[in-house]
């Protein structure tokens, strides 16, 4: 409103630059004294144009956050297969036993399997679909009951999803997958209801493990028989292999068919199927990264161009005062580099929060993606942002060289 009180002739003239003020850094004397003249001028200019300062930082931080999110989502999706089928599930093959095979017959087959050159360990389990009951709607899950606890670590890695500490499957309670616990909103020592073959059972949760696919409930044989009052009848066998050569696979498959033992499937085949499905997601993520990089370039270019156009008179003045070309470049572009560094660092915080929000939003009830950001996502995002900054500074040198000292100084008149 103050412009309404001014004369038209005054309004036609460009606004005078803001007066310089003491900045916070000047009060920290042991740092301020060690700065050169040009560095002091840069710091003053950064804090003098507060609107541009915040606009630049927010714009750069937003672009950096998008790049971090792109790299982070790619890692979160692509790392799931390796995590699930190498870190969590450690067996190599799964055999679905024929319904006619009894538990005693299964033990006999176990000895025969262990005599095969390809097989290292065999573990029999009950693998059965269950309903996990919750307030609003039931969850589809899988109950896995281990017959033996001796070599269980060879087949599955029971690791606490928060602390990473090893969990022990005992007769006190079940071990629940992390995503399932999150959906049920339960913690260790809570109880939960499961429905098995139409009968409802209440069990205690003794541990919550890291898991990425399906809603798993792990139980010991003693606990299963105690809860259900039924004897355990195994229906699956987990195998760990000495070698995964095709010749060994072919030999084992032939043996299974001859003995009418059951259907054999390999874990790595399941992982490959998921990888093929994820490839289409990779394309979307690459587009996101490219668009975020392009947006970063556009924001930096426009901010730099506006900065130069608004300060033509100032640039002309320092040229008249005898600043060399390199000194003029440093005078303007040093601010861009500092603002880019600050914006990039702030963008890492925004990127972490945005990545966390997106991953939690796109997860399904039976899937949990890797929620942690790998360090390289931050590094790549900062390098891309600073790389664009230096490239734009190089391109905008031509604009600085074209600033006409006489015309820029006369424009005020």
Where are these regions (language model features)?
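Short helix-loop junctions at transmembrane helix boundaries
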Residues: 2, 330-331, 344-407
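Short cytosolic juxtamembrane segments of multi-pass membrane proteins
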Residues: 6-23, 398-413
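Short, strongly hydrophobic transmembrane alpha-helices
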Residues: 51-76, 341
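Short beta-strand boundary microenvironments
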Residues: 56, 83-87, 107-190, 202-204, ...
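Peri-transmembrane interface segments
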Residues: 73, 77-86, 248-295, 306-310, ...
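Membrane-interface junction motifs in transport/secretion proteins
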Residues: 73-107, 235-236, 413
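Small-residue transmembrane helix packing/gating motifs
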Residues: 88-89, 168, 208-244, 268
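Interfacial "coupling" helices/loops that link adjacent transmembrane helices in transporter permeases
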Residues: 282, 296-338
